[in-house]
Design a protein with these regions (language model features):
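Glycine-rich flavin
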Residues: 52-53, 57, 75-82, 87-231, ...
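Extreme N-terminal leader/targeting segments of oxidoreductases
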Residues: 37-61, 79-80
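N-terminal Rossmann-like FAD-binding beta1-loop-alpha1 element of flavoenzymes
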Residues: 59-86, 236, 244-253
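Rossmann-like NAD(P)H-binding beta-loop-alpha module
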Residues: 227-271
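Multi-pass membrane proteins that catalyze or facilitate reactions on polyprenyl-/lipid-phosphate substrates
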Residues: 2-49
C-alpha cells in the first residue's frame, strides 16, 4: 500500500529515486522473506513442543556420517573448540574415498594412458596396443585409496579434537542421538545441533531376474574386480550419471565391450 501511495506522488522522473519510494520497494522486497522466517519459526516451535529440550547438553554437535560433508563439518566444529562427536557405521571417508571420486579417478588415469598408447600417432609417436595386468590396475586403485586413508582416519580426527564413534546412529528427538556401537554397546548423547551427512547408496532398478544375475554396484565392484585376473570382456552399465559415465568410459578404454543404459533423454542429465 505504501509503495502504491509513493508511486502516486511521482510527478517527474526524478521522483523515481525519491528516498520514500526506494524505502517502500526495499520493504516490499524483504517482507516475504521476513514473513517466511516468522512462519517457519512458528511451525518449528509447534513441532518441537512435543519434546522436552534438555537443560544441559553433552555435545555442541553430533555429526552422522564420516564422508566428505561429515568430515568437513566435524573438523570446522572442532576448530572453533566445539564439543563434537562424529558417528560412522562403516568406512571413514565415505563414498568419495572408498567407492567414488578416488577409485574412479585412479582407474580413469590408467584407462586414459591405455587410450593414449593406442592413439599415440596423433602425437607423432608410434601407436601400440597396451599390454597390462588387470589385477595390477585394480591393485593400484586400492593402493591409492590406502595412501589417502590416513587423512580421513579415526586417529587423525581424534587428534584434531573430534570424538569419533564407530557405530550406527538413530535420532531419538531433535536433541538426542542414540548410538549402537560396532562393539555392541549402546549409548545416548544430547546435543545442541545434529548434522545428518549419512550419504546415499546406489539405486538398483527392479528388473526381472536382476537379484539372481550377480550384479555389482559402484560400492561393490572395486573389491570384486580386484579379485579378477582378467579384464571383463563385456559390461552393461546401468545409469548415465557421473559414476556410470566414468566407469563406462574407463572400461571401454581398457578394452571391455561396454553398453551404457540410461533411462533419461541423455547421459549426465544434471550437468
Amino acid at each position: 500500500v505504501n509503495a502504491g501511495t509513493e508511486l502516486a506522488k511521482i510527478d517527474s522522473l526524478a521522483g523515481i529515486l525519491s528516498p520514500g519510494l526506494i524505502l517502500s520497494f526495499v520493504l516490499l522486497g524483504i517482507f516475504p522473506l521476513i514473513a517466511k522466517k516468522v512462519t517457519d519459526k512458528i511451525k518449528a516451535r509447534k513441532v518441537y513442543a512435543q519434546w522436552t529440550k534438555p537443560v544441559k547438553f553433552d555435545r555442541n554437535m553430533v555429526v552422522i556420517g564420516a564422508g566428505a560433508a561429515g568430515l568437513v563439518s566435524s573438523y570446522i566444529a572442532a576448530a572453533v573448540k566445539a564439543k563434537v562427536t562424529l558417528v560412522e557405521a562403516h568406512k571413514m571417508g565415505g563414498d568419495c574415498l572408498n567407492f567414488g571420486c578416488v577409485p574412479s579417478k585412479a582407474i580413469i588415469k590408467s584407462a586414459k594412458l591405455a587410450h593414449q598408447m593406442r592413439h599415440a600417432d596423433k602425437y607423432g609417436l608410434h601407436a601400440a596396443t597396451p599390454s597390462f595386468s588387470f589385477k595390477a590396475v585394480m591393485a593400484r586403485v586400492h593402493d591409492i585409496i590406502k595412501a589417502i586413508e590416513p587423512h580421513d582416519s579415526v586417529e587423525r580426527y581424534t587428534g584434531l579434537g573430534v570424538d569419533v564413534i564407530q557405530g550406527y546412529a538413530t535420532i531419538v528427538d531433535p536433541w538426542t542421538v542414540e548410538i549402537k556401537h560396532n562393539s555392541g554397546e549402546t549409548s545416548r548423547l544430547t546435543t545442541r545441533s545434529i548434522v545428518i551427512a549419512a550419504g546415499a547408496q546406489p539405486v538398483v532398478p527392479p528388473l526381472p531376474g536382476i537379484e539372481t544375475s550377480g550384479y555389482l554396484t559402484s560400492d561393490t565392484l572395486w573389491d570384486e574386480f580386484a579379485k579378477r585376473d582378467d579384464l571383463p570382456k563385456r559390461l552393461v552399465v546401468l545409469g548415465g550419471g557421473p559414476i556410470g559415465s566414468e566407469l563406462a568410459q574407463a572400461f571401454a578404454r581398457l578394452g571391455s565391450q561396454v553398453t551404457q543404459v540410461e533411462l533419461g533423454d541423455r547421459i549426465m542429465v544434471r550437468e
